[in-house]
UniProtKB/Swiss-Prot annotation:
This is Glutamate-1-semialdehyde 2,1-aminomutase. Its EC number is 5.4.3.8. It comes from Carboxydothermus hydrogenoformans (strain ATCC BAA-161 / DSM 6008 / Z-2901). It is found in: Cytoplasm. It catalyses: (S)-4-amino-5-oxopentanoate = 5-aminolevulinate. Pfam families: Aminotran_3 (PF00202). It comes from the Bacteria. The modification N6-(pyridoxal phosphate)lysine is found at K269. PROSITE patterns: AA_TRANSFER_CLASS_3 (PS00600). Belongs to the class-III pyridoxal-phosphate-dependent aminotransferase family. HemL subfamily. One of its GO terms (biological process) is protoporphyrinogen IX biosynthetic process. The keyword Cytoplasm applies. Its cofactor is pyridoxal 5'-phosphate. HAMAP family: HemL_aminotrans_3 (MF_00375).
Length: 432
């Protein structure tokens, strides 16, 4: 049954007059699935409600931060109390230190942490710090790994084993792109070749320990360990971008889950409890290079603001409770098994990847281990799948190359309804 979204259609038309593309982040426009975006009015627990009154079980969770679900009472209460004291001061607060202590205690590789306002700020600052610490300029990233929209990270790979960066976006100067080298995720041999040729000029390797922006792609056994070994051998730093995976896949992030310690870690999403936030941290001798302790400059008007710190502390306090990650694993495993069975019953041979409470259904029968294999997915079939799910009250990311996020708020009834709707959506995709 077609979804009634008349008010959302009208709202999108109005938004496009004053906002580029009608949205403040491109994927929200539903362009890749050929639909009009739904405009959300409110959220409650595992559900979101659009301005036309439609209710959806939400697996976007504001793109990952809402691991507790919408309007968790402890987060809401903490924010209400904080608002009574003010919104921002541009001065040190006890909340900043409390948040920093929680983070460094959770991440064994981190002695100090600096708060910023977004994941992009965190990765941008981490790269500047790595260059300042090593005195080198080149950065290695992996194709399909997204680290925010800083110039040096908006780079894709060309052909050949060792390719200097080519800008993905207009507006990125070639001389900036030339300092970014692109490797292939899960391909240690290529990375070894890159270091053999460029190792003395490489300041850092930056990676998502679980790639979450080409679907969900876990590291092959030995891959992260191999990257760690190569960076140490050549005197480069290892930056783990845990903006998505930090406190999502494990308390202490993917680096604790896989037991590989980076030099610098970037965080965001969950540590703000749904408010704008970012952070980067690492070993003391590296972090003491950051101003005002050292010469590497970074600043921010709203960095460490009380509201984000309050929401983040409340969220992390709940996550620290006994059994929380076991609950998330149980829910996520149940959903994954149900989706696999629904796809089989619908006659589709698909590939599923999951790490903790983030998972992805790839519309390909090929094992997905990197950007190239992720791109074998049938995006037209995914678009049919997405549309059918939306019509049946299930809200997932409007892109084949994004994760589904399970939250503590998802009930067994939510998961069962999702599996039932997915069977219908898989059938529709199979017939497309």
């Amino acid at each position: 049954m077609p979804l009634k979204i008349d008010r959302s259609i009208e709202a999108f038309s109005e938004a496009k007059k004053v906002i580029p593309g009608g949205v403040n982040s491109p994927v929200r426009a539903f362009k890749s699935v050929g639909l009009n975006p739904v405009f959300i009015e409110r959220g409650e627990g595992s559900k979101i409600y659009d301005i036309d009154g439609n209710c959806y079980i939400d697996y976007v969770g504001s793109w990952g931060p809402l691991i507790l679900g919408h309007r968790h009472p402890k987060v809401e209460e903490a924010l209400a109390n904080c608002l009574k004291k003010g919104t921002s001061f541009g001065a040190p607060t006890l909340l900043e230190t409390e948040m920093a202590e929680i983070i460094v205690n959770a991440f064994p590789a981190m002695d100090m942490v600096r708060m910023v306002n977004s994941g992009t700020e965190a990765t941008m600052s981490a790269i500047r710090l790595a260059r300042g610490f090593t005195g080198r300029n080149k950065i290695v990233k992996f194709e399909g790994c997204y680290h925010g929209h800083a110039d040096s990270l908006l780079i894709k790979a060309g052909s050949g084993a060792l390719t200097l960066g080519v800008p993905t976006s207009p507006g990125v100067p070639a001389n900036i792109a030339n300092n970014t080298i692109t490797a292939q995720f899960n391909d240690l041999a290529l990375l070894e070749e890159i270091f053999a040729q460029e190792g003395n000029d490489i300041a850092a390797v930056i990676l998502e320990p679980v790639a979450g922006n080409m679907g969900v792609v876990p590291p092959k056994p030995g891959f992260l360990e191999g990257v760690r070994e190569l960076t140490r051998k050549y005197g480069a730093l290892l930056i783990m971008d845990e903006v998505m995976t930090g406190f999502r896949v494990h308390w202490g992030g993917a680096q604790v889950l896989y037991n590989v310690e980076p030099d610098i870690t970037t965080l965001g999403k969950i540590i703000g409890g749904g408010l704008p936030v970012g952070a980067y941290g690492g070993r003391r001798e590296i972090m003491e290079m950051v101003a005002p302790a050292g010469p590497v400059y970074q600043a921010g008007t709203l960095s460490g603001n009380p509201l984000a710190m309050t929401a983040g502390i409340a969220t992390l306090t709940v996550l620290k409770e006994e059994g929380v990650y076991e609950q998330l694993e149980e829910k996520s495993s149940y959903l994954e098994s149900g989706l696999k069975e629904a796809a089989r019953a619908a006659g589709l041979k698909l590939w599923f990847n999951r790490v903790g409470s983030m998972l992805c259904t790839f519309f390909t029968s090929e094992e997905v281990v990197d950007y190239k294999t992720a791109c074998t997915s049938d995006t037209q079939k995914f678009a049919v799948f997405f549309k059918t799910l939306l019509e049946n009250g299930i809200y997932i990311a409007p892109s084949q190359f994004e994760a589904m996020f399970v939250s503590l708020a998802h009930s067994k009834d939510d998961l069962d309804k999702t599996i039932e709707a997915s069977y219908k959506a898989f059938k529709a995709a199979a017939e497309n």
